[in-house]
Structure formats: structure tokens, C-alpha cells
């Protein structure tokens, strides 16, 4: 990733396609005047100017009852900012000339790189939580190593350009899930595993635990049904049986959890040992998670 950033090439943001996010740029036919629109409210206001100048017959947003500043889903369902509708909007330049939208779209990777802001509608909403560091930058990002040229890069590029900040503090780069022989799964080979059938058979928690327990996220995982079955039997069944044993005798003895606490020094040695072991485990698991080592954390458990 570092080498990729060191040898960075210019990023051509535009794409000559139909489907995607339109570039919010309007130009006069001679290209002498141009305008970049920063919000739907601004676009609405510029359309009103075009209507007043006689360039547009009416405001299509107003015709549909759209209200600027109302960020509800119901309000935004009234308009469509994609092609071909947005291309029908003709604005007016400061000198009174018609302005037509740049026909290109923005690269879809720019959409991905805008995720931290777009998903919370920043800066129009959630501005305080974002600006005070609560929502940005992210603590970590998790994706495949191929995203060094994709999502990892575009997030940083936009974050640096707009805020002078990296978009995330740490990276967990996922490996691939292979078959039990280390071969890439494919329908052609017949070695692909249906995740929904696996969840139906073993449950989602044993599958999750197996995947994170078997190998570190950045290593390739040799998936084996037998491994999930073993995790389900040795870990989850043991956990369930332990709880059921406790629950049965707690109910017999009328245990509620509200009983007075016995001071630690007055407890039997084996009780103190169990509590020490538990707290050591909590400390170990917390440290491993803080160090982005979930496999070590699960194996400690």
C-alpha cells in the first residue's frame, strides 16, 4: 500500500457512462462559464433562476412537491438525481447563457471513497458527531488485499483532499476462503460451499467462530465442514452444557444473584483461582482485540 501511494498516478474522476452518479457540473456551450453544484438545495435555487430567466419552463423539483431542507426519505423519493432526469435540467450562467450538465459520471470508486460522509449525509446532517472525531476517521477498515488500489486508496485520497486526514487508523486485510485442500472455490470445480446451507446446518455463531478461530483474518482459510462441526461440539456444546448445569442447580437452590457478596479474601482458594483465571482471560482477550488479533483472542477463550 505504501509503494502504491509513493508511485501514485493522477486519478481520472470522470467516466463516459450512463449508470452512476452524475457529475454536478454545468457549463455553457462555449465552456467559458461553469458551475459546480454543492447541494440539492443549491440546485433547486439555480433552477428557480433558470425559470425566472425563461430558460426552463418550470422547476421539476417544485412540480413534484419537493421541499429543500427536508431530508426525509418520503421527500427525496419525489425526485431522481440520476440520468436521464438530471440532464433535462438547464441552468443559467451569470451572463444569462444556458448551462448544460457535463455528460460524464463520476468514477464509482469516488462513491466508495465518499462512504464516511455520504452514509451519514455530512455536512447537512450529523455534522457535530463527525467534526468532533466520533465518526471520522474510522478505527479500522476490513477488506481484501486487492482493495489497496481501490477502497483503501479512495477513502484516503478523499479524506486527505477534503479534511487533511487519513480515513482510517488501521487495516485488517482479509485473506481468501479456500476449500479444505487449499484450492480456490468455484462452481466449475464443484468445491464451492453454500454459506446458507452451512448456517442452516450448524448455525451462524459456530461458523463465525470457526472462521475467526481457525486462522488469522489476513491468512487464507482452508474451509472444512468437519472443522465447523468440531467447533460446534467442543466449544458451543460445552458452553451450553455449562450454562444448563448452572441454571438447573441455581433454580433448585433458589439462586437469584441478589445474595450478599462474599469478600474475595474469605472465599475458598479454588474460587479465587477461578476468578483470577477469568480476569486474566478478560485482560488477554481485550489486549488481543485492541491489537487487532481476533484469532489469538478466540483461542485464548
Where are these regions (language model features)?
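Intrinsic disorder at enzyme termini
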Residues: 248-262
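Structured secondary-structure scaffolds
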Residues: 1-252, 274-301
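N-terminal accessory segments
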Residues: 261, 265, 269-272, 276-280
Amino acid at each position: 500500500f505504501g509503494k502504491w501511494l509513493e508511485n501514485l498516478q493522477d486519478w481520472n474522476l470522470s467516466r463516459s457512462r450512463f449508470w452512476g452518479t452524475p457529475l454536478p457540473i454545468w457549463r455553457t456551450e462555449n465552456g467559458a462559464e461553469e458551475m459546480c453544484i454543492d447541494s440539492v438545495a443549491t440546485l433547486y435555487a439555480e433552477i428557480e433562476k433558470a425559470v425566472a430567466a425563461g430558460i426552463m419552463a418550470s422547476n421539476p423539483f417544485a412540480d413534484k412537491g419537493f421541499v429543500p431542507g427536508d431530508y426525509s426519505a418520503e421527500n427525496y423519493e419525489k425526485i431522481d438525481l440520476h440520468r436521464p432526469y438530471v440532464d433535462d435540467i438547464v441552468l443559467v450562467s451569470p451572463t444569462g447563457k444556458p448551462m448544460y450538465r457535463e455528460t460524464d459520471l463520476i468514477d464509482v470508486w469516488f462513491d466508495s471513497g465518499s462512504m464516511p460522509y455520504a452514509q451519514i449525509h455530512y455536512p447537512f446532517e450529523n455534522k457535530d458527531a463527525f467534526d468532533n472525531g466520533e465518526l471520522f476517521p474510522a478505527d479500522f477498515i476490513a477488506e481484501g488485499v486487492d482493495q489497496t488500489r481501490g477502497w483503501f486508496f479512495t477513502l484516503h485520497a478523499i479524506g486527505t483532499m477534503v479534511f487533511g486526514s487519513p480515513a482510517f487508523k488501521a487495516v485488517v486485510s482479509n485473506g481468501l476462503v479456500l476449500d479444505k485442500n487449499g484450492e480456490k472455490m468455484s462452481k466449475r470445480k464443484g468445491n464451492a460451499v453454500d454459506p446458507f446451507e452451512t448456517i442452516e446446518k450448524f448455525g451462524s455463531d459456530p461458523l463465525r467462530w470457526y472462521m475467526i478461530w481457525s486462522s488469522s483474518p489476513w491468512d487464507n482459510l482452508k474451509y472444512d465442514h468437519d472443522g465447523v462441526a468440531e467447533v460446534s461440539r467442543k466449544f458451543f456444546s460445552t458452553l451450553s452444557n455449562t450454562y444448563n448445569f448452572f441454571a438447573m442447580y441455581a433454580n433448585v437452590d433458589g439462586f437469584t444473584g441478589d445474595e450478599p457478596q462474599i469478600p474475595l479474601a474469605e472465599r475458598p482458594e479454588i474460587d479465587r483461582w477461578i476468578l483470577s483465571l477469568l480476569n486474566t482471560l478478560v485482560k488477554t482477550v481485550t489486549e488481543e482485540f485492541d491489537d487487532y488479533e481476533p484469532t489469538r483472542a478466540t483461542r485464548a477463550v
